[in-house]
């Protein structure tokens, strides 16, 4: 893939506010395109096919893995997630900066394959705030929440493996800081 500096990786634990920060970034800079990931998980309320995710059956996802059609892929919380390669290449070729919102293992894969990409790890203000955000979604049962919190502790311990660590205290400020990092 040419022009790796146009590839931006945003990662962090579930509930840290990646999606909210990204909405703010996209509203401020029209030259940044958000890559749409594929997943085998069920859509959450309000999520649209092709807008939030490409929702795939597990068989289709595995077929795409076998054909090397993902930039990266990983299994998380019992579901598969991946970044379709074709759309990323197309947008970079057209001159866009491509922003990838992906989980930590996928982010590590991309950083290894594309070392010139910019990787940013988004941190919560603290663990209590992270738990509050996950619970306030109201979309998951207690067992799933506990899994996400356990996974978050592991992921946060890997935050120093990325180019930048940013704590998401304020969405607007975090978005501005990320745009500044992209532009430098």
From Swiss-Prot:
PANTHER family: GUANYLATE KINASE, GUANYLATE KINASE-RELATED. It is an enzyme of class 2 (transferase). The lineage of its organism: Bacteria, Bacillati, Cyanobacteriota, Cyanophyceae, Synechococcales. This is Guanylate kinase. Signal peptide: none annotated. Residues 5-183 form the Guanylate kinase-like domain. The keyword Nucleotide-binding applies. Belongs to the guanylate kinase family. Gene3D superfamilies: Guanylate Kinase phosphate binding domain, P-loop containing nucleotide triphosphate hydrolases. It is found in: Cytoplasm. GO terms for molecular function: ATP binding; guanylate kinase activity. Its main location: cytoplasm. PROSITE patterns: GUANYLATE_KINASE_1 (PS00856), GUANYLATE_KINASE_2 (PS50052). It holds the Pfam family Guanylate_kin. Essential for recycling GMP and indirectly, cGMP. ATP binds at residues 12-19.
